[in-house]
């Protein structure tokens, strides 16, 4: 999941860079090719709209980062709770002299993905 988040963040950074480049190219084209043309007003409007889009994009990136941080915190909390629960179960089994049963293949398969998210 973290790899996907990192990939999305890189995509957002590239899109931001692309928007900067497009704005620069548009400004350059307007200045060099149409310094006093009647269409200049429309080009300026386009540049203003591009700036507004960039601002909205940056706000979206900020919200995305906040969601990403919250998602990581939630995942850590869930993993910690699961670890604590598993430890408590093992302690209860020892205290009550219950036989510790080995996990079935299905249970082992279910715990493998969880292990990758749990701290050592």
From Swiss-Prot:
GO terms for cellular component: centrosome; cytoplasm; kinetochore; meiotic spindle; outer kinetochore; SKA complex; spindle microtubule. Keywords: Cell cycle, Cell division, Centromere, Chromosome, Cytoplasm, Cytoskeleton, Kinetochore, Microtubule, Mitosis. One of its GO terms (biological process) is spindle assembly involved in female meiosis. GO terms for molecular function: microtubule binding. It comes from the Eukaryota. Pfam families: SKA2 (PF16740). It is found in: Cytoplasm, Cytoskeleton, Spindle; Chromosome, Centromere, Kinetochore; Cytoplasm, Cytoskeleton, Microtubule organizing center, Centrosome. Component of the SKA complex, a microtubule plus end-binding complex of the outer kinetochore that stabilizes spindle microtubule-kinetochore attachments, promotes alignment of chromosomes at the mitotic spindle equator (chromosome congression) and assists suppression of the spindle assembly checkpoint. Kinetochores, consisting of a centromere-associated inner segment and a microtubule-contacting outer segment, play a crucial role in chromosome segregation by mediating the physical connection between centromeric DNA and spindle microtubules. Belongs to the SKA2 family. Component of the SKA complex, composed of SKA1, SKA2 and SKA3. The SKA complex is a homodimer organized around a central W-shaped coiled-coil structure, formed by the interacting domains of SKA1, SKA2, and SKA3, each end of the 'W' is extended further by the C-terminal microtubule-binding domains of SKA1 and SKA3; the complex forms extended structures on microtubules. May interact with NR3C1; the relevance of such interaction remains unclear in vivo. Interacts with the MIS12 complex subunit DSN1. This is SKA complex subunit 2. It comes from Mus musculus.
């Amino acid at each position: 999941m973290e790899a996907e988040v990192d990939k999305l963040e890189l995509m957002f950074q590239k899109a931001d860079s692309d928007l900067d480049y497009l704005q620069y190219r548009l400004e350059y084209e307007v200045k060099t090719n149409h310094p006093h043309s009647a269409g200049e007003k429309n080009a300026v409007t386009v540049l203003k709209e591009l700036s507004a889009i960039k601002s909205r994009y940056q706000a979206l990136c900020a919200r995305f980062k906040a969601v990403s941080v919250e998602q990581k915190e939630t995942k850590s909390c869930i993993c910690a709770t699961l670890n604590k629960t598993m430890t408590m179960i093992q302690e209860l089994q020892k205290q009550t002299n219950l036989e510790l049963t080995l996990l079935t293949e299905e249970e082992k398969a279910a715990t493998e993905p969880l292990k990758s998210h749990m701290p050592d």
